């Protein structure tokens, strides 16, 4: 079996770069002391940043205990993320080529697709460990980096038009190991928690459980959304193991490749006057009748009259519905 922690492979994966724009965004958020959610989103936008943050957070004495980026961000000192981003290698997608481009961007895009679909699957399955699932999904293909570092022709040897399961079988035949197992070895070498390592290692097992099952479903959905073949029977089977019934799985498939949202005709007539729109904008800001009256130089009774007309014209019953309706139609 290949040793993913040996010389060439280990160092190459350790130096895997973040997209320049991802790195710049993290630095900007960290330097202005963004809140935890903003920092988590900035880190999770890139697998290289995710690896770097988790490795840093899982050093002694916390080794093996930090399961997610959110936990890591809460654990690390305020200036740590800025220092980490400054030290992280980057690549410019349109700039000079290095050994990872364009493979690095393909890896990042697939990782983020699986990450977001894993969060959606976790939500549908009613799971409460979404942060850990998102982290496992972001890192699920780490072993592919090790294989690509050791075997430059890796992508050409493994048929791109095969299903995920067929590609894993080819890896085992060509290299004696699959990328899931190699990824688990790498994750353990960085002192990541055992549950996270197992999810990375086992997402291509015949019968994955727990987080690995959620990642496996998300991985197949991401391949399907990208136009790659998958085994539908395998998707249904692993969906069951992830506690995702057929209706829930069908709903996610319906949303692919991206969640749908209503698009309103910009020419659709707004039934409100400009004064009434000013009032709705004030409602959106959380202002009450007296505040709106003072701001617009009107009496409170006039504001109440305007509100009655606004509700009637929009067909709503209260201020919250008025703000929602006007926002959805793009009138604000």
Regions found by a protein language model. Give the residues of each.
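Short, structured interface segments
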Residues: 244-263
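Short, locally clustered residues in the helix-turn-helix/winged-helix DNA-binding domain
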Residues: 89, 204-205, 281-285, 327
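Basic, Lys/Arg-enriched C-terminal extension of HTH/homeodomain DNA-binding domains
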Residues: 266-267, 312-332
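Conserved alpha-helical "signature site"
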Residues: 1-154, 167-229, 331
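Regulatory hinge/linker segments at domain boundaries
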Residues: 260-281
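Hydrophobic residues on short alpha-helical segments
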Residues: 277-281, 311, 323
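Alpha-helical residues within the helix-turn-helix
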Residues: 41, 135, 294, 312, ...
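Recognition helix of helix-turn-helix DNA-binding domains
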Residues: 286-321
């Amino acid at each position: 079996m290949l040793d993913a922690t040996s010389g060439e492979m280990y160092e190459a994966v350790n130096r895997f770069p973040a997209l320049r724009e991802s790195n710049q965004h993290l630095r900007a958020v960290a330097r202005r002391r963004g809140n935890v959610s903003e920092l988590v989103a900035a880190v999770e936008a890139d697998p290289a940043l995710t690896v770097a943050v988790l490795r840093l957070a899982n050093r002694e004495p916390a080794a093996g205990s930090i399961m997610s980026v959110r936990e890591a961000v809460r654990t690390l000192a305020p200036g740590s993320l800025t220092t980490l981003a400054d030290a992280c290698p980057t690549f410019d997608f349109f700039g000079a080529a290095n050994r990872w481009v364009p493979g690095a961007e393909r890896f990042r895009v697939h990782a983020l697709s699986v990450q977001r679909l894993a969060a959606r699957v976790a939500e549908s399955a009613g799971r409460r460990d979404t942060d850990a699932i998102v982290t496992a999904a972001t890192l699920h293909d780490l072993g592919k980096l090790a294989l690509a570092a050791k075997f430059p022709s890796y992508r050409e040897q493994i048929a791109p038009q095969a299903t995920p399961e067929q590609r894993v079988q080819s890896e085992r035949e060509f290299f004696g190991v699959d990328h899931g197992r190699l990824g688990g070895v790498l994750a353990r070498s960085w002192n990541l928690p055992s549950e996270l390592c197992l999810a990375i290692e086992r997402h291509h097992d015949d019968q994955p459980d727990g987080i690995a099952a959620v990642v496996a479903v998300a991985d197949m959905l991401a391949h399907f959304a990208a136009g790659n073949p998958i085994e539908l029977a395998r998707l249904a089977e692993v969906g069951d193991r992830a506690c995702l019934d057929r209706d829930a799985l069908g709903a996610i498939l319906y949303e692919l490749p991206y969640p749908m949202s209503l698009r309103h005709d910009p020419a659709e007539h707004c039934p409100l006057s400009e004064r009434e729109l000013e009032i709705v904008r004030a409602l959106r800001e959380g202002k009450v009748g007296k505040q709106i009256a003072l701001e617009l130089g009107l009496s409170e009774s006039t504001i109440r009259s305007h509100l009655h007309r606004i509700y009637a014209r929009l067909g709503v019953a209260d201020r919250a519905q008025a703000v929602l309706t006007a926002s959805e139609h793009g009138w604000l």
